[in-house]
Amino acid sequence: MEQSEKTLDMIVNLCKNRGYVFPGSEIYGGLANSWDYGPLGVEFKNNVKKAWLKKFVQESPYNVGLDAAIIMNPQTWVTTGHVSSFSDPLLDCRACKARHRADKLIGEEHPEVNVDAMSFDEMDAFIAEHEDIVCPVCGKHDFTPIRKFNLMFKTAIGVTEDSSSTCYLRPETAQGIFVNFANIQRTTRRKLPFGVCQVGKAFRNEITPGNFTFRTREFEQMECEFFCKPGTDLEWFAYWKDYCENWLLSLGIKKEHLRLRDHEPAELAFYSRATTDIEYAFPFTDWGELWGIADRTNYDLTRHQEASGKSLEYFDSETNEHYIPYVIEPSLGCDRVALAFLCEAYDEEHLTDSKGKEDIRTVLHLHPALAPYMCAVLPLSKKLGEKAMEIRNELSKYFMVDYDDTGSIGKRYRREDEIGTPYCITVDFDTVGDEAKGIAADNCVTVRDRDTMEQVRMPISELKAYIESKIEF
């Protein structure tokens, strides 16, 4: 199935019907762009996180992990500029009172314009000059001036609400790493270069979230802050671009569905020396940002050092120098890359059986390391349940295993195909034999491959090693 034939509705319907993702708080009418990961979705998303941690922490000789608090000292966000300037440009339609993001209105009507490089005043002037930019709700060109809308969720700590109790839900996980730089370097005794990786929730009060789990107000980030000596940063910037792209390719994303887009100088954040986005060809847009890799220089550590009065310098024993490290940041949204894996894996195959009857097989070609279940155990008859459950219980010590003894074996195969289970293990009467008839058990099972639908017979004792070999990437 070509990428252009897929639609977001196909992905959403499969996720809702098979327990990957449900609308949040659905029995109360839901909450806009709030999604809950169901029984399959939580296993799938956990596997995405495990795959990232495996390559970025476990196998990397440079990186260590961290799990920082969601609610931080509010001075953190004053220092970084989030309190004063982490804002979206909002305007209202005077005719129908609908509220919109100005940059989105401009970008949708004039994709040739680099909106990221425009100031709020420049956006105001551009919209005023272009009457083809109209309200998507009522079609009128009559807007209020742009105003700032801060994206941080504000909360309060303690029993009273006043300015001294104000805190924020973190809009990014990166700052938890920066404020812990000295602690991590001291306790791990790491020398530069080294990185700190974190998986965690972040919150942004987006005015126009959408496209399923692509953009939500509550989301999970997988970020690495890689600290290096100034002057070596561009070399490491190139290293991490390749490393990130190879991780995606190793887990089944096709190279032709990825592109690396370097930010133009006008797009760059004022503290950034270079930024590249790895973009994916999502079915609902031409290209969508998947992964941002940025050279943040020493901006963050310098700001925190100045504001806190605590030294965040690194002493280089080889050169006898003190300096503030530069930072390369590969920042990936877990929910967004999970959606990309689902879009990539989704397929509808048109099949014809031996009688000439046509059928459509819906299948998720997920990499085995990402699939919610690594395998499913299917007894050919419920009479074989004891042996089948014995196999299931043994394999479940090592990975997630599904068990299904309801319906024809063909229908059970199709159910497992649709949820992405890479291997189905069929227990039949030859497996257990028949002592009364003098037929010895062969202690073998049939293993069916999801993608090829081919079947092989193998001893039960070889199942664990066989499946584990397929999970590697």
Residue ranges, per PLM feature:
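NTP/phosphate- and nucleic-acid-binding module
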Residues: 1-473
